[in-house]
Regions:
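Bacterial Sec-dependent N-terminal signal peptides
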Residues: 1-21
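Non-catalytic, glycine-rich low-complexity segments
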Residues: 17-27, 37-38
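A surface-exposed beta-strand-loop module
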Residues: 25-26, 57-120, 134-136
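Surface-exposed beta-strand/loop patches in extracellular or lumenal glycoproteins
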Residues: 33-65, 132-134, 138-149, 156
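Extracellular structured ligand-interaction cores
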Residues: 34, 68, 88, 99, ...
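Zn2+-dependent metallopeptidase catalytic core
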Residues: 64-67, 107, 139-157, 169-175, ...
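Extended, low-hydrophobicity, Ser/Thr/Pro/Gly-biased non-transmembrane segments
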Residues: 103-186
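Juxtacatalytic substrate-recognition/specificity segment
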Residues: 187-266
Length: 266
Protein backbone atom coordinates (compact mmCIF):
# COMPACT_ATOMS: atom_id res chain seq x y z
CA UNK A 1 0.00 0.00 0.00
CA UNK A 2 2.82 2.39 0.89
CA UNK A 3 4.57 1.62 -2.40
CA UNK A 4 1.36 2.29 -4.35
CA UNK A 5 0.88 5.64 -2.60
CA UNK A 6 4.52 6.57 -3.29
CA UNK A 7 4.12 5.64 -6.97
CA UNK A 8 0.91 7.68 -7.23
CA UNK A 9 2.59 10.69 -5.63
CA UNK A 10 5.56 10.42 -8.00
CA UNK A 11 3.24 10.15 -11.03
CA UNK A 12 1.27 13.23 -10.00
CA UNK A 13 4.51 15.14 -9.35
CA UNK A 14 5.90 14.32 -12.79
CA UNK A 15 2.61 15.26 -14.42
CA UNK A 16 2.62 18.62 -12.64
CA UNK A 17 6.12 19.33 -13.96
CA UNK A 18 5.44 18.37 -17.57
CA UNK A 19 5.78 21.15 -20.13
CA UNK A 20 2.89 21.01 -22.58
CA UNK A 21 2.41 22.34 -26.09
CA UNK A 22 -0.45 22.59 -28.57
CA UNK A 23 -0.28 23.66 -32.19
CA UNK A 24 -3.20 24.46 -34.50
CA UNK A 25 -3.50 25.37 -38.17
CA UNK A 26 -6.72 27.31 -38.72
CA UNK A 27 -4.89 29.86 -40.90
CA UNK A 28 -2.86 27.33 -42.87
CA UNK A 29 -3.88 29.06 -46.11
CA UNK A 30 -1.54 31.89 -45.07
CA UNK A 31 1.20 29.53 -43.80
CA UNK A 32 0.48 30.30 -40.15
CA UNK A 33 0.28 28.08 -37.08
CA UNK A 34 -0.74 29.04 -33.55
CA UNK A 35 1.57 27.60 -30.90
CA UNK A 36 0.71 27.53 -27.20
CA UNK A 37 2.94 26.30 -24.39
CA UNK A 38 2.52 25.93 -20.64
CA UNK A 39 5.42 25.80 -18.19
CA UNK A 40 4.11 24.86 -14.71
CA UNK A 41 5.85 24.87 -11.33
CA UNK A 42 8.32 27.59 -12.32
CA UNK A 43 10.39 28.55 -9.26
CA UNK A 44 12.52 31.38 -10.64
CA UNK A 45 11.47 35.04 -10.67
CA UNK A 46 11.72 35.12 -14.46
CA UNK A 47 11.72 32.51 -17.20
CA UNK A 48 13.63 32.88 -20.44
CA UNK A 49 12.02 31.16 -23.43
CA UNK A 50 13.68 31.12 -26.80
CA UNK A 51 13.63 29.83 -30.33
CA UNK A 52 16.47 27.56 -31.30
CA UNK A 53 19.31 28.82 -33.48
CA UNK A 54 20.32 25.35 -34.62
CA UNK A 55 18.80 22.05 -35.68
CA UNK A 56 19.96 18.41 -35.44
CA UNK A 57 22.35 17.58 -38.26
CA UNK A 58 22.60 21.18 -39.46
CA UNK A 59 26.03 22.69 -38.86
CA UNK A 60 25.02 26.31 -39.32
CA UNK A 61 23.09 29.00 -37.47
CA UNK A 62 19.42 29.37 -38.37
CA UNK A 63 17.53 32.27 -36.82
CA UNK A 64 14.18 30.51 -36.38
CA UNK A 65 12.92 33.41 -34.26
CA UNK A 66 12.53 35.49 -37.42
CA UNK A 67 9.37 33.51 -38.21
CA UNK A 68 7.69 34.21 -34.83
CA UNK A 69 5.33 37.11 -34.08
CA UNK A 70 2.28 37.95 -31.98
CA UNK A 71 4.00 36.72 -28.80
CA UNK A 72 2.15 37.00 -25.49
CA UNK A 73 2.51 35.50 -22.03
CA UNK A 74 0.03 34.97 -19.19
CA UNK A 75 0.02 33.41 -15.72
CA UNK A 76 -2.16 30.60 -14.42
CA UNK A 77 -5.10 32.99 -13.97
CA UNK A 78 -4.83 34.23 -17.55
CA UNK A 79 -3.39 37.60 -16.52
CA UNK A 80 -0.80 39.22 -18.83
CA UNK A 81 2.82 38.95 -17.75
CA UNK A 82 5.62 41.44 -18.29
CA UNK A 83 7.93 40.44 -21.13
CA UNK A 84 11.39 41.83 -21.88
CA UNK A 85 13.88 41.05 -24.63
CA UNK A 86 17.65 41.39 -24.56
CA UNK A 87 18.43 39.55 -27.81
CA UNK A 88 16.58 38.73 -31.06
CA UNK A 89 15.65 35.14 -30.18
CA UNK A 90 14.62 35.20 -26.48
CA UNK A 91 11.72 36.43 -24.37
CA UNK A 92 12.22 37.01 -20.61
CA UNK A 93 8.94 36.58 -18.75
CA UNK A 94 8.18 37.74 -15.20
CA UNK A 95 6.84 34.90 -13.05
CA UNK A 96 3.93 35.78 -10.72
CA UNK A 97 2.24 32.51 -9.70
CA UNK A 98 4.47 29.65 -10.89
CA UNK A 99 2.63 29.00 -14.16
CA UNK A 100 3.72 30.62 -17.41
CA UNK A 101 1.66 30.29 -20.58
CA UNK A 102 3.00 31.54 -23.89
CA UNK A 103 1.31 31.89 -27.26
CA UNK A 104 2.66 33.02 -30.61
CA UNK A 105 2.11 32.84 -34.35
CA UNK A 106 4.57 30.88 -36.48
CA UNK A 107 5.03 31.61 -40.17
CA UNK A 108 6.17 28.44 -41.94
CA UNK A 109 6.63 27.95 -45.68
CA UNK A 110 9.80 25.97 -46.31
CA UNK A 111 9.21 22.23 -46.19
CA UNK A 112 12.39 20.24 -45.69
CA UNK A 113 14.66 18.95 -42.95
CA UNK A 114 15.47 22.32 -41.39
CA UNK A 115 12.48 24.67 -41.48
CA UNK A 116 8.73 24.00 -41.28
CA UNK A 117 5.89 24.39 -43.75
CA UNK A 118 2.19 24.94 -43.14
CA UNK A 119 -0.33 25.18 -45.96
CA UNK A 120 -3.57 23.52 -47.04
CA UNK A 121 -1.75 20.35 -48.11
CA UNK A 122 0.12 19.62 -44.88
CA UNK A 123 1.94 20.77 -41.78
CA UNK A 124 5.53 19.63 -42.15
CA UNK A 125 7.24 20.41 -38.86
CA UNK A 126 10.87 20.51 -37.86
CA UNK A 127 10.58 20.90 -34.10
CA UNK A 128 13.42 23.41 -33.48
CA UNK A 129 11.95 25.66 -36.18
CA UNK A 130 8.50 25.48 -34.60
CA UNK A 131 8.51 25.37 -30.80
CA UNK A 132 9.97 27.68 -28.16
CA UNK A 133 11.61 26.16 -25.12
CA UNK A 134 13.02 27.08 -21.72
CA UNK A 135 16.61 25.91 -21.43
CA UNK A 136 16.42 25.81 -17.62
CA UNK A 137 13.57 23.27 -17.90
CA UNK A 138 15.14 21.07 -20.57
CA UNK A 139 15.08 17.87 -18.50
CA UNK A 140 11.31 17.97 -17.99
CA UNK A 141 9.05 15.59 -19.93
CA UNK A 142 6.99 17.14 -22.70
CA UNK A 143 3.49 16.57 -24.05
CA UNK A 144 2.47 17.90 -27.45
CA UNK A 145 -1.02 17.93 -28.96
CA UNK A 146 -1.31 18.47 -32.70
CA UNK A 147 -4.69 19.97 -33.58
CA UNK A 148 -4.84 18.32 -36.99
CA UNK A 149 -7.34 19.71 -39.50
CA UNK A 150 -10.25 17.26 -39.65
CA UNK A 151 -11.74 19.07 -42.64
CA UNK A 152 -8.55 18.23 -44.57
CA UNK A 153 -8.41 14.61 -43.29
CA UNK A 154 -5.06 15.24 -41.63
CA UNK A 155 -3.32 12.58 -39.55
CA UNK A 156 -0.13 12.76 -37.49
CA UNK A 157 3.08 10.84 -38.14
CA UNK A 158 6.10 11.20 -35.84
CA UNK A 159 8.65 9.17 -33.89
CA UNK A 160 7.31 10.63 -30.62
CA UNK A 161 5.59 8.25 -28.22
CA UNK A 162 1.85 8.15 -28.80
CA UNK A 163 -0.36 8.81 -25.76
CA UNK A 164 -3.90 9.25 -27.08
CA UNK A 165 -5.62 10.74 -30.11
CA UNK A 166 -3.21 13.41 -31.45
CA UNK A 167 -1.24 13.79 -28.21
CA UNK A 168 2.35 12.55 -28.03
CA UNK A 169 5.15 12.73 -25.48
CA UNK A 170 8.92 13.08 -25.20
CA UNK A 171 11.07 12.31 -22.14
CA UNK A 172 12.94 15.61 -22.40
CA UNK A 173 13.67 18.58 -24.65
CA UNK A 174 16.52 16.85 -26.48
CA UNK A 175 14.27 14.03 -27.69
CA UNK A 176 11.48 16.45 -28.59
CA UNK A 177 13.79 18.58 -30.74
CA UNK A 178 14.90 15.50 -32.68
CA UNK A 179 11.37 14.36 -33.60
CA UNK A 180 10.14 15.86 -36.91
CA UNK A 181 6.45 15.47 -37.67
CA UNK A 182 4.33 15.20 -40.82
CA UNK A 183 0.64 16.10 -40.54
CA UNK A 184 -1.39 15.52 -43.68
CA UNK A 185 -3.71 13.14 -45.48
CA UNK A 186 -0.81 10.76 -46.01
CA UNK A 187 -0.72 7.09 -46.92
CA UNK A 188 1.35 4.47 -45.15
CA UNK A 189 2.82 1.00 -45.45
CA UNK A 190 4.59 -1.12 -42.83
CA UNK A 191 6.19 -4.49 -42.28
CA UNK A 192 7.80 -6.37 -39.41
CA UNK A 193 11.47 -7.26 -39.08
CA UNK A 194 12.61 -9.20 -35.99
CA UNK A 195 9.58 -8.02 -34.04
CA UNK A 196 10.05 -4.35 -34.93
CA UNK A 197 7.88 -2.27 -37.25
CA UNK A 198 9.30 -0.44 -40.25
CA UNK A 199 6.75 2.17 -41.34
CA UNK A 200 6.73 4.36 -44.42
CA UNK A 201 4.53 7.47 -44.40
CA UNK A 202 4.06 9.10 -47.81
CA UNK A 203 2.45 12.42 -48.62
CA UNK A 204 2.30 12.86 -52.39
CA UNK A 205 -0.19 13.08 -55.29
CA UNK A 206 0.86 9.91 -57.13
CA UNK A 207 -1.22 6.72 -57.58
CA UNK A 208 -1.19 3.78 -55.17
CA UNK A 209 0.61 1.62 -57.74
CA UNK A 210 3.62 3.96 -57.65
CA UNK A 211 3.67 3.81 -53.86
CA UNK A 212 3.55 0.01 -53.95
CA UNK A 213 6.54 -0.11 -56.31
CA UNK A 214 8.48 2.36 -54.19
CA UNK A 215 7.62 0.51 -50.99
CA UNK A 216 9.01 -2.77 -52.30
CA UNK A 217 12.31 -1.01 -53.01
CA UNK A 218 12.37 0.49 -49.52
CA UNK A 219 11.78 -2.93 -47.96
CA UNK A 220 14.63 -4.39 -50.03
CA UNK A 221 17.00 -1.67 -48.79
CA UNK A 222 16.03 -2.28 -45.15
CA UNK A 223 16.54 -6.03 -45.47
CA UNK A 224 19.87 -5.54 -47.22
CA UNK A 225 20.99 -3.27 -44.39
CA UNK A 226 20.20 -6.06 -41.95
CA UNK A 227 22.12 -8.54 -44.11
CA UNK A 228 25.18 -6.29 -44.20
CA UNK A 229 25.29 -5.49 -40.48
CA UNK A 230 23.79 -8.72 -39.18
CA UNK A 231 20.97 -6.95 -37.36
CA UNK A 232 18.96 -3.76 -37.22
CA UNK A 233 19.22 -1.27 -34.34
CA UNK A 234 16.78 -1.51 -31.46
CA UNK A 235 14.35 1.31 -32.19
CA UNK A 236 12.49 3.27 -29.53
CA UNK A 237 8.97 1.90 -29.03
CA UNK A 238 9.81 -0.88 -31.52
CA UNK A 239 9.28 1.26 -34.61
CA UNK A 240 11.23 3.16 -37.27
CA UNK A 241 9.35 5.66 -39.46
CA UNK A 242 10.18 7.08 -42.87
CA UNK A 243 8.47 10.47 -43.28
CA UNK A 244 8.34 11.26 -47.00
CA UNK A 245 6.78 14.27 -48.67
CA UNK A 246 7.10 14.52 -52.45
CA UNK A 247 5.22 17.55 -53.72
CA UNK A 248 5.83 20.70 -55.79
CA UNK A 249 5.52 22.98 -52.74
CA UNK A 250 8.37 21.47 -50.68
CA UNK A 251 11.99 22.57 -50.79
CA UNK A 252 13.79 19.26 -51.21
CA UNK A 253 15.88 18.01 -48.30
CA UNK A 254 16.46 15.06 -45.98
CA UNK A 255 17.49 14.54 -42.38
CA UNK A 256 18.13 11.51 -40.17
CA UNK A 257 16.71 11.86 -36.64
CA UNK A 258 16.95 9.14 -34.00
CA UNK A 259 14.11 6.84 -35.05
CA UNK A 260 12.85 8.37 -38.27
CA UNK A 261 13.97 9.81 -41.58
CA UNK A 262 12.68 12.97 -43.27
CA UNK A 263 12.55 12.86 -47.09
CA UNK A 264 11.31 15.77 -49.20
CA UNK A 265 11.57 16.44 -52.90
CA UNK A 266 9.65 18.15 -55.68
Amino acid sequence: MKLWIAFLFLSLSLQAQTNSYTISFDNAVHHEAIVKATFPEVKSKTLRVQMSRSSPGRYAIHEFAKNVYGFKATNGAGEPLEVKRDDPYSWIITNTDGTINVEYILFANRGGGTYSQVDLTHAHLNIPATFMYAETLQERPIEITFDARKDLNWKVATQLKHKEDNTFSAPNLYYFMDSPTEISNFREREFKVDGQTIKFVLHDPDPESDFDTYWEKVKAIVLQEKAVFGELPTYDFGQYTFLACYAPNVSGDEMEPRNSLILTDT
